[in-house]
C-alpha cells in the first residue's frame, strides 16, 4: 500500500508540472518562492539537497527553498522551471539535456557538450547551466565479475557474440529514446539483443547480482557497482554521450538572489565520480536518507566555511 501511495504521489506531481499548473504549496509564501527540483534517482536527490543546504547556509537562513522530489524526467524538471513552479534544479546532465530538452544531436566530447548545453539554455530559456560538479554519470553496460571472466568480456563490442544468450535489462526511459537510446545503439554497434526488457533502472543491479539478468545497462556512479562487484564494460565505440552533472538555475532567480549563484558555484568541480558513487552507496545500500547523506558530506568537507577560514 505504501508503494502504491508513493506511485500515486509521484504521478500526481509529474502530471501537475506537465500540465503547467502550479504545484500545491509553491506559492511565493513558501521558501521565499524558491523551489528546487530533483528526479527519482538517489543521486539527483542527494545533490539537490546539497543545493538546498548550501542556499540556506549562505543566505543565513533568509532563503529556505522547498523541494519538488521524484520528478520522472529531465523534461518534467525543465517544465517546472519554465512554468515558474521551480527556479533551481539540483542535477541536470549534459547528454540528457542535449538530446532530450534541447533536441540536439549527441556529442561525444565533454567540453563541447557542456558548451553547447550552456549556450542553448542561456540563449533560448534565460537559464544558467553551471559547470560540472566534477562527475560524469553516463550509461554503461555491466555484468557480474563471474560473467566477465567466463565470457572474456571487456568492451561493449564483445557482447556481439552473445546477443541471443544473455537476458538484458535496460532503463525504461532509454529503451525508446531518440538520439542516444536503444534504436541508435543498435545502429552504432550493429547488433540488437534477443532477450531485452525495459525496467526501472534502480532494479537492474540486484537483478544482475542474483542472476535474474546476465547483462544490464546502468549508471556509472551507482554505488551498487562496487557493492555487487560488477564489471563495467568499456563503451569502445564511444556511443554514450557524456552525462556531466551540473546545478541549474534561472537567471531571474540568481539576479534577484545573487547568494544562490554563490552557493551553487561553490560546489563546482568538487565531487568526483568515485565520491558520488560512495554517496549513492550510503543511501541505496546503507539506507541513509539522501538529505542526511548530503548534510553529512557538506559538513565533513567544510562546505559551510567561508573562503579563507
Question: What are the residue ranges of the model-derived segments?
Answer:
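Bacterial signal peptide processing site
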Residues: 22-25
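A bilobed periplasmic-binding-protein/Venus flytrap-type ligand-binding module shared by bacterial periplasmic
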Residues: 138-149, 244-257
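C-terminal motif of bacterial Sec signal peptides marking the signal peptidase cleavage site
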Residues: 17-20
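An extracytoplasmic/periplasmic, membrane-proximal ligand-sensing/linker region
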Residues: 43, 177, 188-191, 265-309
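Bilobed "Venus flytrap"/periplasmic-binding protein-like clamshell domains
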Residues: 31-71, 134-205, 288-292
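Short helices/loops that flank or line small-molecule/ion binding pockets
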Residues: 54, 75-86, 102-104, 183-188, ...
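Ligand-binding "clamshell"
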Residues: 100-109, 115-130, 212, 224-238
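Bacterial N-terminal signal peptides that target proteins for export
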Residues: 1-8
